[in-house]
Amino acid sequence: MNVTVSIPTILRPHTGGQKSVSASGDTLGAVISDLEANYSGISERLMDPSSPGKLHRFVNIYVNDEDVRFSGGLATAIADGDSVTILPAVAGG
């Protein structure tokens, strides 16, 4: 399945400055693997190394505006033409 992935500014150095990229996969996990295959190092910014198979807690990912934390996480199904949005959490004081 081909999807469009919106890349936040903080991750654009991994995609050569591109705001959005194409990726493929039938689950979110497969899409992230495809991103890593094409944009080395990007998955390290998304995945929690202390919890294999889990996203960093400060990374929010949406598939068609639905938060994947409530729709299956990395197992979230992806359909052709879906949009994936990556949003890093922002904190301040």
Curated annotation (Swiss-Prot):
Expression triggers: Up-regulated under oxidative stress conditions.
CysO-cysteine adduct, modified sites: G93
One record GO biological process: cysteine biosynthetic process
Keyword Amino-acid biosynthesis among record annotations: yes
In-chain residues carrying the UniProt-annotated modification 1-thioglycine: G93
Recorded GO CC terms: cytosol; protein-containing complex
Biochemical pathway: Amino-acid biosynthesis; L-cysteine biosynthesis
Keywords: Amino-acid biosynthesis, Cysteine biosynthesis
A Pfam family that the UniProt record links to this protein: ThiS
Keyword check for Membrane: no
UniProt modification remark: Thiocarboxylated by MoeZ.
Family (UniProt): Belongs to the sulfur carrier protein CysO family.
Function: In its thiocarboxylated form (CysO-COSH), is the sulfur donor in the CysM-dependent cysteine biosynthetic pathway. May be of particular importance for cysteine biosynthesis in the persistent phase of M.tuberculosis.
Protein name (record): Sulfur carrier protein CysO
Organism from which the protein derives: Mycobacterium tuberculosis (strain ATCC 25618 / H37Rv)
